[in-house]
């Protein structure tokens, strides 16, 4: 876990004994060092992979990390894939335009090759049924419907913690405050690589007729209804996300905040109505002056979309 590996080549002569000195620095957490040697290999694995890619109809290229690279209580040294995996992806994609890159990682990574891959699947660390699940998705037995629970940045320097990491004396302050996650990218007007809430499907969905309706819940102060239609040819599931913006807010608050979401299953051509009800708490901010949650009198814009940046419909109401 932790730092990138340091590699070097040493020529050994048969029958001689050698002494090696390995130096490393302990920074106060998880003191450990791993030492290993790779036996000479008559095969050039990069050349073998690219040769196969050149001849194949399509390529499923599985890359990623494991607990040696990312784990709880420890930070990754960079967002690059370990070793020469990025180089491998670049070369394979250049040789075969039908390359599906499968990311078996536990967190975002940089993707210099993003425009070269035909498709990219973020599979996280799915466990022992990974192979069966992956084949079901790739061969269309199952239509994927997951959404990203975090933002994938284009570069490490785009992340909220970049300017303050690693802190001092093993302590780091998260200075973005309320603007965590997608809220940071909204405020700084930084385009992510893949937005919070982004996902793939073999079908398409149309959002329409978003409107304010009378709330039915006893604690609701606003309600919105919309229609969603499966406009494709296969069964699919969509997670409709509802965000709230405050027009001309006098409070230092995020540009928009996810307040509601609902997963809906639709056959080809089928439409359903979805209703989102909002309570005072959904619209409140914490007043440090009054030490209480309060609703700011303002125009509240309700947006629905397929991700934090893929907004399909919006409408507004005045509250307060």
Which residues does each predicted region cover?
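C-terminal non-catalytic regions of proteins with extracellular/luminal or membrane-system context
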Residues: 1-320
């Amino acid at each position: 876990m932790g730092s990138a590996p340091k590699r070097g080549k040493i020529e050994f002569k048969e029958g001689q004994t050698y002494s090696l000195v390995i130096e490393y620095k302990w920074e106060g957490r998880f003191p450990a060092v791993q030492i290993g040697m790779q036996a000479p290999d008559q095969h050039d694995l990069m050349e073998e992979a690219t040769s196969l890619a050149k001849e194949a109809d399509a390529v499923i290229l599985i890359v990623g990390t494991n607990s040696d690279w990312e784990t709880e209580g420890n930070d990754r040294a960079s967002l690059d894939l370990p070793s020469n995996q990025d180089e491998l992806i670049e070369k394979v994609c250049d040789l075969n335009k039908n390359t599906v890159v499968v990311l078996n990682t536990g967190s975002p990574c940089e993707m210099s090759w993003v425009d070269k891959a035909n498709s990219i699947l973020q599979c996280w660390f799915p466990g022992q049924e990974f192979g069966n699940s992956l084949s079901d998705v790739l061969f269309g037995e199952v239509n994927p419907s997951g959404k990203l629970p975090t933002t994938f940045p284009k570069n490490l320097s785009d992340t909220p913690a970049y300017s303050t990491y690693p802190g001092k004396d093993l302590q780091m302050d998260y200075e973005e405050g309320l603007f965590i996650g997608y809220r940071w990218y909204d405020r700084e007007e930084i385009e992510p690589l893949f937005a919070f809430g982004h996902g793939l499907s073999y079908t398409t969905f149309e959002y329409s007729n978003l409107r304010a309706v009378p709330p039915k819940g006893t604690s609701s102060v606003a309600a919105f209804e919309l229609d969603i239609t499966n406009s494709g040819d296969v069964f699919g599931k969509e997670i409709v996300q509802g965000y709230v913006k405050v027009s001309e807010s006098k409070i230092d608050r995020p540009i928009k905040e996810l307040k509601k979401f609902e997963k809906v299953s639709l056959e080809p051509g089928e439409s359903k109505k979805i209703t989102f009800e909002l309570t005072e708490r959904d619209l409140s901010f914490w007043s440090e002056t009054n030490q209480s949650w309060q609703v700011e009198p303002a125009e509240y814009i309700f947006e629905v979309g397929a991700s934090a940046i893929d907004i399909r419909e919006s409408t507004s109401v005045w509250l307060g």
